[in-house]
Amino acid sequence: MYEGVIQDLIDELGKLPGIGPKSAQRIAFHILGADPSQVRRLAEVLLDVKERIRFCAICGNVAEHEQCRICADPRRDPTVLCVVEEPKDVVAIEKTREFHGRYHVLGGAISPIDGIGPDDLRIRELLQRLADGTVKELILATDPNLEGEATATYLARLVKPLGVRVTRLASGLPVGGDLEYADEVTLGRALEGRRQLDV
């Protein structure tokens, strides 16, 4: 264990997802040996992100303005809405270049064990978006794990009375995996082969 601010830095870096103690230590010593201008730039960017980035008022994706670039793009198909758990999932699907509709970011998935229920997600906002009848197809692109499946089933049942076609990404994605780790080809095929959910 180190003393003072270097240990504080290691501890803070270790709180980041995917960064274990060894990685945190390696990053801390990289920062320590880096040019002060690089470190200053990193600090500025971190602060800038916290100050300038917000969530899109429409879909919940990350944005620098009130609307994200996807919601602001009139070329996107407003009749197809893809529901994802997190903004990183939007990026994963966008990389496929197969989807031309719009998104709705839930902000997570239903997970009773973690104390996350439907009221903790952006489901109310989703229903508001569906209310005007513009959306004809709702693609449920939640992660193919227990929480993602539970969320998809919940949403499918909730939306069924609205008469919107509800589909789920096709298989091919590994069960228990996260969308952000799927390669573009697999994710693209999953989008092409999506199926309707019968609940």
UniProtKB/Swiss-Prot annotation:
Keywords, sorted A to Z: DNA damage, DNA recombination, DNA repair, Metal-binding, Zinc, Zinc-finger
Zinc finger residue extent: C4-type: 56-71
GO MF terms held by the record: DNA binding; zinc ion binding
A Gene Ontology BP annotation from the UniProt entry: DNA repair
Residues in coiled coil: none
The keyword Metal-binding is annotated on this UniProt entry: yes
Toprim domain boundaries: 79-174
Similarity comment text for this entry: Belongs to the RecR family.
Function per UniProt: May play a role in DNA repair. It seems to be involved in an RecBC-independent recombinational process of DNA repair. It may act with RecF and RecO.
Name of the protein in its database record: Recombination protein RecR
Lineage, top ranks: Bacteria, Bacillati, Actinomycetota, Actinomycetes, Acidothermales
